[in-house]
């Protein structure tokens, strides 16, 4: 089995196309379809709405992705999937943390509500408001909150964020007394936020320095994927 890892650092208009190319590259390297995918949205501050909708659409066959509701009818919109799933239903785990905001929360919420992915990590930032900037005659601008984002199940993201299905906390270790001759190290791996590049992909189970060995949550996500694949195989 081959499992992919993709990190999205922000959402832009071309993020979906870039992500799809990376997935195709991973499958070419594997020589077969991926058995599962880790989608890393940690410390992703968001970006453009269309980018989040298009990325969600890559993994959903039907249903609502996100909706906006405002004080007036012209602020109400619904964005839906267009009957495609580039992974053909292969299991997914999405990594999030409190640095995951806005567009990241839209993607995580959509995949979670549709049961398409397990969300692993910590509660997200909670930025689910639609803001409009109105220019003023004096050259200044006024920023107004005109609507809010809602997940497919009608959950408001604003101020509440996305609760992960599985909460991952950094492991804390107490120092063992010196006379025992042993000492515990902090084993919680943490991959620093990478600068530049919107999408970075690699095969999670490959490479000389395996990603799951230096990033605790990626390792946990990979274990979850392996478990889900095994359960599906036994059920099938």
Language model features: what each stretch is:
Residues 1-236:
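C-terminal "post-core" interaction segments
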